[in-house]
A protein has these predicted regions:
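Thioredoxin-like thiol-disulfide oxidoreductase module
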Residues: 78-128
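N-terminal start-of-chain detector that recognizes signal peptides
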Residues: 14-15, 41-43, 104-111
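N-terminal regions that are enriched for targeting/export leaders
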Residues: 1-40
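Local sequence-structure signature of Cys/Sec-based thiol-disulfide redox active-site neighborhoods
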Residues: 28-80, 86-90
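A short linear-motif detector with a strong N-terminal bias
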Residues: 20-22, 48-49, 115
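A generic structural signal for solvent-exposed, polar alpha-helical segments
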Residues: 23, 30, 56, 95-97, ...
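A short, hydrophobic beta-strand/beta-hairpin element that forms part of a small beta-sheet core
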Residues: 132-135
Length: 135
């Protein structure tokens, strides 16, 4: 399979979606990743069904006070125009002007001051292959 530019491009010969392995598949509650309120941030796009599923589970488990949420703009944009054509979820600083107000999207990520989810992944794990994450 050729290197992918987004999770949507991970399709096998039969047209089925095949997710690549991720560096971010650890379990919260382990010694390395203790379950501590405020330690983690859930990033979501309300346009992404996978992300909306995580919001539903967070609510069903009553974790709203434990895991804060940051919402990104509901459309993809080029994440590093000077470097490559990768498109992914972005914050208001890089989004269409009307996207941020409708969904209370912050200008930048509150943790890393990043302007895209790709930049958040790269800040958390500098060696991450951005093509293999839904960014």
């Amino acid at each position: 399979m050729l290197p992918v530019k987004s999770a949507l491009a991970e399709i096998d010969a039969d047209g089925a979606f095949v997710r690549s392995a991720s560096k971010f598949e650890h379990r919260i509650g382990s010694e390395q990743f203790p379950a501590v309120a405020g330690r983690y941030m859930l990033y979501v796009s309300l346009a992404c069904p996978w992300a909306c599923r995580t919001l539903a589970v967070r609510a069903l488990k009553g974790l709203e006070h434990v895991i804060p949420v940051t919402i990104v703009a509901p459309r993809w944009a080029i994440t590093k125009p000077q470097q490559d054509a990768h498109m992914g979820w972005v914050f208001r600083s890089r989004a269409h002007a009307s996207d941020g107000d409708l969904f209370e999207v912050p200008l930048v990520d509150p943790v890393f001051q990043a302007d895209s989810i790709r930049a958040v992944y790269e800040a958390a794990e500098p060696d991450v292959e951005h093509e293999k994450v839904c960014s």
